[in-house]
């Protein structure tokens, strides 16, 4: 959807008319944004994510990670056999894109006390696979499915 630049107010309303959230967001002319509904200290909030293009080689893919957990703390994501590492992605942080060749890769989400080597001494929270097509961008959004900091699930968005 195209929105004029400025500070439009985003409203999240239930079918019964109850307003769960009203929050202004900053929109710059010509920008592409993703808006995620997230938990905050005061209830619901909107996280504005700038969707910048990935500078990739022809026929490559790009991937990034968004840690949208409320109290999940820093998380590590390793794709493939350490082909791409995202270390200590803090709650509320969205990483820059990394370039990777298309294909199917396993990925692991973990928490570790060793930030330099996230696979050593780590606690695995999630393991799954991601299929990357050429000339596409992917974001792995991490959420909690219950209040436990270790209850992590992923939503992968292709763009």
Annotate each language-model stretch with its function.
Residues 1-159:
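Intrinsically disordered, low-complexity polar regions and short flexible loop motifs
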